[in-house]
Regions:
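Terminal amphipathic helices with adjacent charged low-complexity linkers/tails
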Residues: 77, 85-91
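Amphipathic alpha-helical substructures
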Residues: 50-72, 76-77, 292-310
């Protein structure tokens, strides 16, 4: 099984287990319950439906047709689009001379916001986006490249017009090295300007690593975060190649572990060496969280272990 410092770090489980581990089932059930309680509470409050009734409706699939939604109070009316004009009129919304209503599309709204930005003051708040898995190196696209994001943060740090920075994080994590590169630049930035992290749907593992130096961290009730933990994967293909394709390997080598790779199982010493690196990253991670959030390391360890939270 892959080396891991955390029993809740479940990303490796599909490769080594036929079903969820007890620890993963525990954390996933609590996450699901937390998310459902938040959603159900909001619906219950907004629509005046008590939680017991809402859970019964959900369990028995009592709302599957528009008429069901109307009956149970999930919607107020069932109308065609053209009938909405009557609703607008009842609400006192003014139409033009042709009886039509002027709608603003999202694109038009964005253009207006851009036009308004021309009148901004000399002092600015920079918004930097960190969206996607965290990977090493430089680049652009659907991932967060460690060196590229660090350079962006360095740029806003050097910009005298920027008085504060908001980092919008929406990431499941990724490379520990890239996360540390970003973390370092966040530390340098924080020393000079206020830094606020705004978490999106998730800011877990490396996503939390890069967030923890911020002066303030803001999350949504449904944000999945935490997962403070580390794992290492080392693929061994020797059995699959031998049993499926009849391919075998032999080698000569200069040193004991010179042949360490996918075509040979790890020796106890090799596994211990990898685990040493995993443990080092985990210790660094938990210490940085303790430092950034001003918490005792023991408190961080209580909520770490790779466990996700909402």
């Amino acid at each position: 099984s892959p080396p891991t410092a955390c029993k809740y770090k479940s990303a490796v489980e599909p490769y080594i287990l036929p079903k969820m581990s007890d620890a993963n089932r525990e954390q996933m059930q609590e996450l699901v319950n937390s998310m459902w309680n938040t959603i159900a509470g909001s619906v219950a409050e907004a629509r005046g439906i008590d939680l017991e009734t809402l859970n019964r409706i959900t369990d028995k699939l009592e709302v599957s047709l528009p008429e069901d939604a109307l009956e149970h109070g999930f919607v107020d009316s069932l109308l065609y689009e053209d009938q909405m004009n009557d609703v607008f009129a009842e609400l006192g919304v003014q139409s033009d001379s042709d009886g039509q209503y002027n709608f603003v599309t999202l694109g038009e709204y964005a253009l207006q916001v851009s036009a308004d930005l021309k009148n901004i003051s000399a002092d600015q708040v920079a918004i930097v986006y960190a969206d996607g898995a965290i990977v090493d190196g430089e680049g652009f696209g659907r991932e967060i490249y460690g060196n590229t994001l660090a350079a962006t943060l360095a740029g806003v740090r050097a910009d005298e017009k920027v008085k504060a920075v908001v980092l919008r994080v929406n990431s499941p994590g990724g490379s520990a090295l890239a996360s540390d590169v970003i973390w370092r630049e966040m530390e340098l930035l924080k020393a000079e300007k206020p830094v606020i992290v705004s978490m999106g749907s998730y800011a877990a593992s490396g996503g939390y690593y890069i967030s923890c130096p911020a002066d303030v961290i803001v999350a949504d009730k449904l944000t999945l975060t935490g997962s403070i933990g580390v794992f290492g994967m080392y693929l061994n293909t020797i059995d699959a190649l031998k049993n499926k394709l009849g391919i075998t390997f032999d080698a000569v080598k200069s040193n004991t572990s010179a042949g360490m790779g996918m075509t040979s199982p790890l020796t106890p010493a090799e596994r211990a060496s990898i685990m040493r690196g995993v443990d080092k990253v985990y210790t660094t991670f938990t210490n940085l969280v303790a430092q950034g959030r001003n918490l005792p390391v023991e408190k961080v360890l209580d909520i770490a272990g790779g466990r996700g939270w909402s």
